[in-house]
Structures are given as structure tokens and as C-alpha cells.
UniProtKB/Swiss-Prot annotation:
Origin species: Bombyx mori
SUPFAM superfamilies hit by this protein: Insulin-like
Gene Ontology CC, one term: extracellular space
Signal peptide feature range: 1-20
Result of altering residue 62 to H: In strain: Showa
Protein's UniProt name: Bombyxin B-7
UniProt feature coiled coil, ranges: none
Gene field: BBXB7
Length: 90
């Protein structure tokens, strides 16, 4: 009986861990944080401060490249996922 309970608990814990990894968390990105995150994603710059080396005009170029609804509308005014941010990369 105890072995069955432990096994069941293990299955539940593993299921919860896997379902958490599969869901991408939506966050808000505004201002400098938005620009730095886009630079990191679009230019493959390391997260440890490399975004500051991305040229300003490149960063600005991708801030509104999807038509009327810009990245600010989708990711600053409401939460978005990294997949949405990646869709703004050239």
C-alpha cells in the first residue's frame, strides 16, 4: 500500500513539473527592458549585458515591424510571451 502511494505521489509531482515547463509565461516588457530583451532575442547577444552593444537603430527598427499593432501594444500594455517577441525579429 505504501509503495503504491509513493509511486502515485511521484507521478503527480513529475506531471506537475512537466506541465509547468510546457507553458510559457507571459510577461510585460516596457521601455529599456523591452528594447534590451528584443536585442538579446533578435541578435543572439548573451544575456549578461551584451544588449547594450546592439546598435540603437537596429533596436528601433524592430520595435514596430509588424504593422499597425506594435510590440509595445502587444507586450507593454499587456503580457506577451517570448514567442511573440521573437515574431518581431527580422
Amino acid at each position: 500500500m505504501m509503495k503504491t502511494s509513493v509511486m502515485l505521489m511521484l507521478v503527480v509531482v513529475i506531471s506537475l513539473m512537466c506541465s509547468g515547463e510546457a507553458q510559457e509565461v507571459a510577461r510585460t516588457y516596457c521601455g529599456r527592458h523591452l528594447a534590451d530583451t528584443l536585442a538579446d532575442l533578435c541578435f543572439g547577444v548573451e544575456k549578461r549585458g551584451g544588449a547594450q552593444y546592439a546598435p540603437y537603430f537596429w533596436t528601433r527598427q524592430y520595435l514596430g515591424s509588424r504593422g499597425k499593432r506594435g510590440v509595445v501594444d502587444e507586450c507593454c500594455f499587456r503580457p506577451c510571451t517570448l514567442d511573440v517577441l521573437l515574431s518581431y525579429c527580422g
